[in-house]
């Protein structure tokens, strides 16, 4: 089996992937808190770990993947109050919307998508075990806290020192805690909030405990890879390790992989900062493959700058690939499978080598683009036999592994998307001219005409942008 190397956040080094069970990779990836539509920042781990899963399957592993939904949280409760609906309606709605957006991106469903609320009984039992082992304690009001100082090596994932954390901690007004660093395992109920029974009080689980319990129940006491965004390293993943070690005496995962953040004008893309760009809007404007090329164009551990210009570049790159594939299938609508020769093996070996080296998708994509050039060159030279080989590499090997270029429908979608963008940009430029000449009435009519077509103009310091609403 191909030797695969990954960067492990815990050991802070690139290490060979040596699975606990030969030939099987068990992987847990933290999913979203379902209180809104997912944005491009949420989509990066979805696309990255879906592609990693595809690659591991390609080189011969059986992959068992779990990705959870946090379906009870303050944000969900607040959203429900704002819209005067039940909290479960909010969670159910945005779980369905998540799968809709995942389908738009061509991200496969995990083997399991557990919800926190389906594991409350197991969570309560886990907390009881930690209390018995003296790793947790109930407070006077029924809250239950994890005693961080019971673990001497707390902070090993993030590289944080307990004493430094203590010194840098803000004054904690929560007098129920024995130590300001202790984190909540069980929250006592507030009026009007959903609650579950427990030995301590009616309440609900804390955030960190859910992943420890769900991963253990579905993948066992220890599994191979735990993935997620680097913003989860501390405190979420650090606390997961603490809980799992308290419960089982060992960390939940052998390896930890974390993707970098999407950056918008210097800040992390997040709903709290109001700088998000929703997945469905991105796919509509830049196409599925344009968005996925963008998300795979940088090494997964590196931060990525988000901008309209960068997405446009990736959309055009995707269009060039589709043009080459469609050029071949217009001549040969039903391409056969070629015999793998030495040249093809060399291409495949380079592609696998790139992804085996800490999942280096930028290098893998450069090999894909080189192959597309060779496809066009072979077509130009009338060498259809070689063109078939290059087509096969792009369409049937590289594409399925990375999760791109898997739909013939994409051709028309991409053409339409680019043409629509050019049309709207032309109208925006015309409107700007009218505004410059103080012909505001005509400028407003152009804006209103677009709005009637569900295209909303947004005048920003960086210029006029637009969004398309359903």
Swiss-Prot record:
Keywords: Aminoacyl-tRNA synthetase, ATP-binding, Cytoplasm, Ligase, Metal-binding, Nucleotide-binding, Protein biosynthesis, Zinc
Enzyme Commission (EC) number: 6.1.1.16
Sequence motif: 'HIGH' region, positions: 32-42
Record-linked SMART domains: DALR_2 (SM00840)
Any GO CC annotation of this UniProt entry: cytosol
Cofactor note (record): Binds 1 zinc ion per subunit.
Residue numbers binding Zn(2+): 30, 211, 236, 240
Reaction(s) catalysed by this chain's protein: tRNA(Cys) + L-cysteine + ATP = L-cysteinyl-tRNA(Cys) + AMP + diphosphate
Record localization: Cytoplasm
GO biological process, one term: cysteinyl-tRNA aminoacylation
Ubl conjugation is among the record's keywords: no
GO molecular function: ATP binding; cysteine-tRNA ligase activity; zinc ion binding
Entry binding sites for ATP: 271
Family, per entry: Belongs to the class-I aminoacyl-tRNA synthetase family.
Official protein name in the record: Cysteine--tRNA ligase
Species in which this protein is naturally found: Fervidobacterium nodosum (strain ATCC 35602 / DSM 5306 / Rt17-B1)
